[in-house]
Amino acid sequence: MEAFNLHKKAVSRDYIVKPRLEYRTVSAVNGPLIILQNVKSPRFAEIVNVTLGDGSVRRGQVLEINQDKAVVQIFEGTTGIDNKKTVCQFTGEILKTPVSLDMLGRVFNGSGKPIDGGPPILPEAYLDIQGQPINPQSRTYPEEMFETGISSIDVMNSIARGQKIPLFSGAGLPHNEVAAQICRQVCLVSTCTLVKRSGKDEEDFAIVFAAMGVNMETARFFRQDFEENGAMERVTLFLNLANDPTIERIITPRLALTFAEYLAYEKGKHVLVILTDMSAYADALREVSAAREEVPGRRGYPGYMYTDLATIYERAGRVEGRPGSITQLPILTMPNDDITHPIPDLTGYITEEQIYLDRQLHNRQIYPPINVLPSLSRLMKSAIGEGMTRKDHSDVSNQLYAAYAMGKDALAMRAVVGVEALSQEDLLYLEFHDKFERRFVNQGAYERRDIYTSLDMAWDLLRIFPVQMLRRIPEKILQEYYHRTSNYEHKENKPHSSRS
């Protein structure tokens, strides 16, 4: 009788008014995946609305098609799904997210639904969460330096607007505090002076924060920090917490980046996107791969993880003819502090910069515990120098790197032969090593140093050495800056002009 009623319903249905097909053919549930049989013309990446027996609705996406079978991943998890009462409706649409300027100042879950108790969003458009690939020919080379107010970043690993800057961290390290400090203090070098004088932030600056698998404490920390600093009205949060479905973490960064692209390329805003924790995202990717019984790659992660991560990281940048930009700050915790782990390893290949947080510096009460030696910025050279920061910037950075590396060698030598066997030069390098970490790298969480102050502090440290030992700095630069008592009084106020 039930079959007769279903057949009667199908025959009498008005497919013009209600064209979507519905199925009750769930044959298997495997982790975050369900398998449907006898499906008519399913499409890859098609969105499926899954209605459970209790009336709740979940969303899924077609991952794999084999004749009349379809493998669907459920974003909200498969708990409670059975093969009798579950109804699956194929929408014929890809996954899109509503976007609107009203989303600024709001909090959403990992699926893009409001969770702050505010009114529903009135969308201005629905955009594909996969975004549109940027033509390399239309990309604008990043040439405007972001001043973070952190000396070890601004002087030695300068950030350009439109860059990807992952924070390589570990469990228990203050990566959240460093990311929050960057958000509080970041501005263009060319506009920082104007911002200080007016006391106002850039009106066209916005922050999109996406959390994947973080605990409630981390989410509360960022939200409270934004609110206390009066920045919440230009911040949008997408929160997938540790107790939320794992599979949801795959779409959370894409929702955040889609909204960021809307702000940058449609509304002309300069957007900073914070993604934490990318390790949780990669683990979710591994879980889906294992459920699909794919051949695993290194440490069980899928072989296509490099490509998948690139679809996220490469959505940063600037587009010619568009006034906005997207700068990414992904945070990833390295398992066992292993930088050769597949997640940081592949991330380092894709991104143009990496900031490495060191546990030994953290144990010595140095904040931020940024180890400058494994850190790097591949786009730094185009964003610094005369007319942009100061003409001695590049040479000072090179000399700091060289002196700090020599200090590390002297430290290792002292542990073997003792301090009595060290030469006078080695003792100078040891002194520089200690003062570099205690004075230059170490600074307060709410201490902001502009680029000129940081460069002056670097010169104060380099004066530990006689002029003949500063071999990385040209003679002309040494004559101009080495004997100055206060370089900050002679700063070159020739900022790089902002570009639309």
From Swiss-Prot:
GO terms for cellular component: proton-transporting V-type ATPase, V1 domain. The keyword Ion transport applies. Gene3D superfamilies: 3.40.50.12240. It comes from the Eukaryota. InterPro entries: ATP-synt_VA_C, ATPase_a/bsu_AS, ATPase_F1/V1/A1_a/bsu_N, ATPase_F1/V1/A1_a/bsu_nucl-bd, ATPase_V1-cplx_bsu, P-loop_NTPase, V-ATPase_su_B/beta. GO terms for biological process: ATP metabolic process; vacuolar acidification. The keyword rRNA-binding does not apply. Pfam families: ATP-synt_ab, ATP-synt_ab_N, ATP-synt_VA_C. Keywords: Hydrogen ion transport, Ion transport, Transport. GO terms for molecular function: ATP binding; proton-transporting ATPase activity, rotational mechanism. HAMAP family: ATP_synth_B_arch. Belongs to the ATPase alpha/beta chains family. Non-catalytic subunit of the peripheral V1 complex of vacuolar ATPase. V-ATPase is responsible for acidifying a variety of intracellular compartments in eukaryotic cells. V-ATPase is a heteromultimeric enzyme composed of a peripheral catalytic V1 complex (main components: subunits A, B, C, D, E, and F) attached to an integral membrane V0 proton pore complex (main component: the proteolipid protein). This is V-type proton ATPase subunit B. It comes from Cyanidium caldarium (Red alga).
